Amino acid sequence: MSRAELDKNPRDVASMFDGVARRYDLTNTVLSLGQDRYWRKATRSALGIGPGQKVLDLAAGTAVSTVELNKSGAWCVAADFSVGMLAAGAARRVPKVAGDATRLPFADDVFDAVTISFGLRNVVDTQAALREMARVTRPGGRLVVCEFSTPSNALFATVYKEYLMRALPRVARAVSSNPDAYVYLAESIRAWPDQAALADQIAGAGWAGVRWRNLTGGIVALHAAHRPPR
């Protein structure tokens, strides 16, 4: 699977991530020039979580993001539909659950906060996933979506697109266990909605108070919202 225009069949997407799991964390750090660590810290800060709270880290992959969230003192569970990714993070001692973002294996209103980092773009039905996140979050609970976005500076945006389509696949061939998956990555980023459009989608799924801020010049955006009362 290497084209962003395909139907994002959950089995195909899970298989793709199973194929990159072994070197996934290293590849991400190399391709992001180390910015992935900063993005994880920013996500934890935006959630505003603390001891005694329950947090769902959706599309958690190898659970490196969950470990960062754990630094808050909250109880955090990693969920992903790629069993291979969860297995690659077996050494990270956090609870792990295999599950589809559009059919989460959790009861209603159980989490104080939910976050998804670089995973919403890969879900077959974005609105269904956002509604499921709202379902499992208590009223007043928080959502943070960390996702690739659109650089705010036009010149920077042009340079970034060139990096995505030309340099990124070449670097991936050198460090990734499945370079074709990163061709899909580049194309899916280009096809993804910008900051305002994603904010509209989040609000349309029932979340309130949607706002965003850019990281790394808009390469990544953090969208935050809260679950309104019933």
Swiss-Prot record:
Positions bound to S-adenosyl-L-methionine: 62, 80, 100-101, 117
Reaction(s) catalysed (UniProt annotation): a 2-demethylmenaquinol + S-adenosyl-L-methionine = a menaquinol + S-adenosyl-L-homocysteine + H(+)
Pathway listed: Quinol/quinone metabolism; menaquinone biosynthesis; menaquinol from 1,4-dihydroxy-2-naphthoate: step 2/2
Pfam families per record: Ubie_methyltran
GO biological process, one term: methylation
Listed EC numbers: 2.1.1.163
Molecular function GO terms recorded: demethylmenaquinone methyltransferase activity
Cited InterPro entries: SAM-dependent_MTases_sf, UbiE/COQ5_MeTrFase, UbiE/COQ5_MeTrFase_CS
UniProt entry keywords in alphabetical sequence: Menaquinone biosynthesis, Methyltransferase, S-adenosyl-L-methionine, Transferase
Gene3D superfamilies referenced in this protein's UniProt entry, alphabetically: Vaccinia Virus protein VP39 (3.40.50.150)
PANTHER family in the cross-refs: 2-METHOXY-6-POLYPRENYL-1,4-BENZOQUINOL METHYLASE, MITOCHONDRIAL, METHYLTRANSFERASE
NCBIfam families for this protein: MenG_MenH_UbiE, PRK00216.1-2
Family from the record: Belongs to the class I-like SAM-binding methyltransferase superfamily. MenG/UbiE family.
Record function comment: Methyltransferase required for the conversion of demethylmenaquinol (DMKH2) to menaquinol (MKH2).
Protein name per the record: Demethylmenaquinone methyltransferase
Phylogenetic placement of the source organism: Bacteria, Bacillati, Actinomycetota, Actinomycetes, Mycobacteriales
GN (gene name): menG
